[in-house]
Every structure is written in structure tokens, then in C-alpha cells.
Regions:
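Conserved SGNH/GDSL esterase-like catalytic core that processes O-acyl groups on lipids
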Residues: 85-181
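Serine-esterase "nucleophile elbow" of acetyl-processing enzymes
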Residues: 27-113
Length: 334
């Protein structure tokens, strides 16, 4: 098990997160002031009255204290930062949480972003803070904050760097030192900074923290399929070219290799959320939600690294199956 960060590391992460949070909030204060001035100067600003009502889940009896309203019904407000699993064309986890469970979601997720980019000075947290303002303006607070990241730190054009050539006896396959550096150091450090930064932002701006949900990935099959098949200017494939580069051509072998590295990623997250200072963070294990069996994996996976949408797109609703795992956790929150 990789060691948890020491006190000095934790202190430096907290200091960096606090500074980043203060810089973001200073930009938000400037934006709020400009918006307030614009509305003051507006000849007829539109006033919108919203009524927040506790809405029971389908089939449940409404509590005695619930008011009756059709003004602003929602299962709750969510904030999200992340990668393509939160920002995929037409369907993704967030659209399923919206459509299937009734959440209102403010997202700063951007497909293709590595986790270390998300938390950088040019990352997603400024837009995250703007989304938080929008929720607060409605008189609400976030039910939870969702974080999806790390896949783009592993997959992509540099993926082959993680693999030793098949002929490099006695160490063909995953280069453990490189894997440790990428997953257990770079990605884990970026996750720590992301979580501490989000907590710092919320504490400084709203006086409290909120539940944070992170997730691992499921087991993919590196079959060479990109977005809409890939090729040309279309994104992908993300995995098979790296295996081809290192002369691994047996899809059964490479599928098992992906199981190994996905397990490594999930173990990192499982350990990370148990570190001191993260009592508000929950990890969701998505492994074995979708299939990686050669018999039916294409029913569940649209391409190498993204689930199927089902319906008119064919196959199973992989996004829906994953969103159901999120809902199982969200349903336990107040």
C-alpha cells in the first residue's frame, strides 16, 4: 500500500488549496459585484420567485411537513467536476442523474481533462465556484459534489509509456514503477488537492463542507474502438495503440492487463478516502457494473473507455447502470 502523505505534505496541500480557493473566491467576488451593478443599472430586471419543496422519491408517501408545489421540483442540487464520464455527447452519468432521478446539476466537467489539469490554475474550479453561486442564489445548498477524474491521466497517446515491451524479459507488461508514479503519486496527489480545494472553497464561501463522491472506473476492453468507431478527427482509440506499440496483440491478455491497472486505480481511491481530513468523501466502486466478457462487452461499452447509452443506440444502458450506483449513495444523504 502506498504511504499516506506525511504531516508536512498535508500542510503544503492545505496551504496550496487555501491559496487557490482564496484566489478563486476573489475572482467570484469581482464577478458578483459586476453582476450586481449590471442588475442595478438594468431598467427592468426580471424577478423570479422560486419555492423549494421536499419532493419524495417515486412511490414514497410524502412527509407530513412537505408542502405542495410545482414551482421548483428537484431531488436536490449537485455540483460536478470531471472528465468525459460527466461530459460525454448526449448521454453521460450526469444526464442520467438528471433524467432518471430528478437532480439539478451545475457541472464544470470537461471531456479529456486529466485530474491534474482540473485542479490547476486554469482548471475547473472557477466554473465550479460559479455553479455554487447559482445554487445559492436559489436559496439552496448542494446535496453533494461529484468528482470524476484520472482516466485521462492513464489512457491516451502516452498510454504505451506505462507498458514494457512483450519481449522485455523478465519484465514484460505493466511497468510497475511508472504505474506507481502515475496512479499512486501524480493522480493521488491531484485528487488530494482537488478534495482539499473543494472543501476549502465551500468552507470559506458557505461556512461548511458538503458530501463529496468520487468513483473508480469499470473494466474496459482495449479493442481499438474510438468515438463513433474512431478514425480521422474522431477521438480514440485510447488503449489498443499503446498495447500494439509494445506488441501485445491478444485481446484476452490485454483485457486482463486492463483489469489489473483498473484495480490498482480503485485501490488508490479506496485508500485515499480513508485518509485523515476526508470524512465527507465517499468512494463508489463501479467495477463489474458493465461486462468485459468477450461474449457481450459491446452491449455495455460504446467504445474502449465509455459506456453504452442503450435505447436507439442499441445495447444496454451502461450509463444508467452506473448512475444507479451513484443514486444508491445519494439516496442516503439528507
Amino acid at each position: 500500500m502506498p504511504p499516506s502523505p506525511g504531516n508536512n505534505d498535508q500542510s503544503s496541500i492545505q496551504q496550496a488549496a487555501d491559496q487557490h480557493a482564496e484566489e478563486i473566491l476573489e475572482r467570484r467576488r469581482e464577478s458578483r459585484a459586476r453582476r450586481a451593478a449590471a442588475l442595478t443599472a438594468h431598467p427592468q430586471p426580471l424577478s423570479i420567485k422560486t419555492e423549494l419543496t421536499q419532493v419524495p422519491l417515486a412511490g414514497a408517501a410524502p412527509p407530513a411537513s412537505a408542502s405542495v408545489s410545482t414551482t421548483a421540483q428537484t431531488a436536490g442540487y449537485l455540483l460536478a467536476v470531471g472528465d468525459s464520464w460527466f461530459d460525454y455527447p448526449i448521454h453521460d452519468i450526469l444526464t442520467r442523474l438528471d433524467d432518471n432521478y430528478g437532480y439539478n446539476i451545475e457541472s464544470s466537467a470537461h471531456r479529456g481533462d486529466p485530474i491534474e489539469t482540473m485542479v490547476s490554475q486554469v482548471g475547473q474550479l472557477d466554473k465550479f465556484a460559479r455553479g455554487m453561486d447559482k445554487i445559492v442564489a436559489l436559496g439552496a445548498t448542494p446535496k453533494a459534489i461529484l468528482v470524476s477524474g484520472g482516466g485521462d491521466d492513464i489512457a491516451g497517446k502516452e498510454f504505451g509509456m506505462l507498458i514494457n515491451n512483450i519481449d522485455l524479459i523478465p519484465v514484460p507488461g505493466w511497468n510497475d514503477q511508472v504505474i506507481a508514479g502515475v496512479i499512486d503519486t501524480r493522480i493521488a496527489t491531484a485528487y488530494r488537492l482537488m478534495i482539499v480545494s473543494i472543501n476549502s472553497l465551500c468552507q470559506k464561501d458557505l461556512g461548511r463542507t458538503f458530501p463529496i463522491i468520487v468513483h473508480g472506473y469499470d473494466y474496459p476492453v482495449p479493442d481499438g474502438r474510438g468515438f463513433l468507431g474512431g478514425g480521422g478527427l474522431l477521438p480514440g482509440p485510447w488503449l489498443k495503440p499503446g498495447f500494439d506499440e509494445k506488441l501485445f496483440s491478444d485481446i484476452n491478455v490485454t483485457t486482463q492487463m486492463m483489469t489489473t491497472v483498473i484495480d490498482r486505480f480503485n485501490i488508490m481511491l479506496q485508500n485515499l478516502v480513508q485518509e485523515p481530513g476526508f470524512p465527507n468523501v465517499t468512494y463508489i466502486d463501479l467495477r463489474k457494473t458493465l461486462s468485459n466478457s468477450q461474449n457481450n462487452y459491446k452491449d455495455w461499452w460504446a467504445n474502449e473507455i465509455h459506456p453504452n447509452a442503450g435505447g436507439i443506440f442499441g445495447g444496454q444502458d451502461g450509463w444508467g447502470a452506473i448512475a444507479a450506483k451513484f443514486q444508491a449513495v445519494l439516496a442516503t444523504l439528507p
